[in-house]
Every structure is written in structure tokens, then in C-alpha cells.
Amino acid sequence: MCNSKKRLALFASGRGSNGEALYKAMQEGYINGEFVVIITDHGTAGIVERSKSWNIPLIVIQRSDYDSKASFEQAQLDALEPYKVDGIVLAGYMRIVGAPLIERYEHRILNIHPALLPSFPGLHGHQQAIDGGVKITGCTVHFVDAGMDTGPIIMQNTVPVLPDDTEDTLSDRLLPIEHKTYKEALRLFCEDKLTIKGRVVYIED
């Protein structure tokens, strides 16, 4: 187990509910890590107010402020550099992470997706599950690679899909499971208990 706290960056585009669950788990000592900076691509996102209450530096990096994808991605790298982060946590970050960030932080970027990958990647995972007629769906915490929700899977948990489910009801049922799963996966990451071999993530007992 690593004794020193992992220095983590939180990337979020929305209200930051998963980020809040992780932050609380850190404050309670369950996760041996700390958010040292928050990056958002929306200056009016709910995570902005959360960052103030947490007293964590927030940096707004919006794609529209940059002439090119390359300059936008370089701005992300430049923003992170002073904080010397050990890992990046994506929590409702709605942009595809570019190659420069993935290469710089290989196997150190975590994401949560509201479906049982490799099924139903991309947007609207809840609705995809309903439309697909599956009886069970869930969430997946995975390392980020260059594909769309294709990185090595760390952990998954499930919920039933009910006959009368809507995207909203299924999302509400899954959200607390997302919080639980992400907290456990990040705890393992911060304790250096995850090893990647090919496509498989092994968890140290």
C-alpha cells in the first residue's frame, strides 16, 4: 500500500455528483487521495460551485477558446503540470480525452460509464440499455485509452432494468451504484493495487 496520498485532478462537465461522492470518501479517509485541481470545460457547470465549497482550485478550459484541438489539449497539459498529479479522474466529463493527455498519464486516467462495457459505449448508455431490451445493466469503471469507452475494465456493478423504466428512472437507480463502484475503484488505484496486463486489470488482495 502507498502511504502518501495520491494527487488527483478531477475533470467534470456537469454537476459533479460522482465527484462529490469521491470527495466525501477522501474526506472520510476511505480513499487515500486528494483532488488538488479541478478542470472543467463549462464555466457555468455545477462543479464550479462545488469547487468553491471544497476550496480546490478550478480551471476552466473551454474548447471554443482555442483555435485548434492541439492547442486545447496542450492547455490541459499546461494546466496540470504545476500540480504534479498522480492521476486523473473523469466524472461526467463530456469530451473525449485526447492523445497527449492519454500518453502523458497512461493507465492513470479513470472514467466511469453508465453501462456494462463493452456494451452500450458512448452517449445515452441508459437509453441504449432500455432500447436493447437487456434485463441487467450497470456501470463500469475503466482506464481511459484512445478509443470510445474501450480502456481496460477495473470494476463493474449491476442493476436490473425494469419493464417500465425510462432513461431517468434507470439513471436514478444506477447513480448510487456508480458512487459505490467509483469509490472502490479509486481506493484501489490510490493504494497501488491495480495491475494491467494486456486488456486485463488484476486487483491485489
Show the residue positions of the predicted features.
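N-terminal Rossmann-like dinucleotide-binding module
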Residues: 2-46, 50
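Short, basic/aromatic-enriched C-terminal tail that caps enzymatic domains
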Residues: 20, 196-205
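Amphipathic, non-transmembrane alpha-helical secondary structure
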Residues: 20-24, 49, 74-81, 183
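Donor/substrate-binding cores of folate-linked one-carbon enzymes
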Residues: 25, 41, 87-200
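Conserved beta-strand segments of alpha/beta enzyme cores
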Residues: 34-37, 57-59, 108
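Short, structured coil segments at secondary-structure junctions
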Residues: 54-55, 105
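Short beta->alpha connector loops at strand-helix junctions that form conserved
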Residues: 59-64, 112
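Glycine/small-residue-rich loop that forms an oxyanion/phosphate-binding "nest" at active or ligand-binding sites
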Residues: 60, 67-85
